[in-house]
A protein has these predicted regions:
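Conserved class I S-adenosyl-L-methionine
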Residues: 62-117, 132-136, 155, 219-241
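Class I SAM-dependent methyltransferase SAM/SAH-binding core
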Residues: 122-178
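A short acidic, Gly/Pro-enriched loop at the edge of an enzyme's catalytic core
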Residues: 177-189
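A short SAM/SAH-binding and catalytic strip from SAM-dependent methyltransferases
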Residues: 188-200
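A short glycine-rich, Lys/Arg-flanked "PGG" loop and its adjoining helix->strand segment in the class I
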Residues: 202-214
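Short alpha-helix
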Residues: 246-262
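Core SAM-dependent methyltransferase catalytic element
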Residues: 262-281
Length: 281
């Protein structure tokens, strides 16, 4: 990242190490993925997993996956922006080889263009990440009230630094699957590169719908499977194992079906393996 001493070769080395990890997982990684028994739980490196007798295995799995996601983004925060924004040759090469040349900058521009420049309502940005794509737009909406939420405190800290001094913006830590917010609280919900990481996607769709006002806009972009074999391989064998992405993932048809059940007036597009859209509740 510019200003943090993260070079192009370091980005490439990071990606290569991730690929190697897919073929040669460490003993620790194998242990941390085994959560079927109390013994395996004690071997796990998850910090916030409580050792309780629980008949619902999905509760334990969700807690484990949430911690895995938090730790994954903490370990990668120094190269996160650089890879997404394709600031150098190596990150552009990575996007061309593994993501069919999809430009996240262009998709971010299209997503944010759904929000008028004179917007003065309420916005929920979840997950805000580091605010690398939204900083300029959110800062310009002086008459709006914007809530930026992320599960990762490390990502949130970077977003807070970027958005510091914007009195109309507040940053909060939280879980998209259990939003501590009133029903119909927001005019617009934005979710950029989030749903492919959320461990409980059903809850995320339900909660974002719940806090959105009638006639409100749900605007998002994220990975969908079935568009590129090499991208699907990367996601399934590396990103999911590292905790950056969390299965299950939707195909285009499955995602369209979900949105059609919840929303109307859907403007839906696909660029490579990324879907982006704007829906009206």
């Amino acid at each position: 990242i510019s200003g943090q001493g993260i070079s192009g070769p370091e980005n490439l080395a990071f990606i290569c190490r991730s690929i190697a990890a897919a073929f040669f997982p460490s003993r620790t990684a194998i242990k941390s993925r085994s959560i079927g028994t109390n013994r395996n739980l004690r071997n796990s490196r998850c910090k916030n997993l409580y050792f309780v007798v629980c008949s619902n295995k999905s509760v334990l799995m969700e807690s484990y996956m949430a911690d895995q996601i938090k730790e994954a983004y903490q370990s990668s925060k120094n190269i996160y922006d650089n890879v997404l924004t394709q600031r150098n040759f190596f990150s552009r090469l990575y996007a061309k080889v593994f993501w069919s040349g999809t430009d996240d900058n262009e998709i971010a521009h299209k997503v944010l263009s759904y929000i008028p420049d004179d917007f003065d309502g309420t916005i929920l940005d979840v997950p805000v990440g580091t605010a690398v794509f939204t900083e300029e737009k959110w800062a310009s909406l002086k008459n709006a009230h914007i809530t930026c939420l992320d599960y990762s405190t490390d990502m949130l800290e970077q977003a807070e630094k970027r958005l510091n001094g914007c009195g109309h913006i507040r940053c909060v830590q939280g879980d998209v699957g259990d939003l501590q917010m009133d029903d119909t609280a927001f005019d617009v919900i934005v979710s950029m590169n989030g749903f492919h990481a959320f461990p409980n996607k059903e809850a995320a769709f339900r909660e974002t719908w719940r806090v959105l006002k009638p006639e409100g806009k749900f605007i998002a972009c994220f990975y969908i499977k079935g568009k590129s074999g090499i991208t699907d391989w990367l996601v399934g064998n590396i990103f999911s194992k590292k905790g950056w992405f969390t299965p299950p993932f939707q195909t285009e048809e499955q995602l369209r079906n979900i949105l059609n059940r919840l929303y109307k007036a859907i403007d839906f597009h696909v660029d490579g393996s990324i879907a982006y859209f704007c829906c009206t509740k």
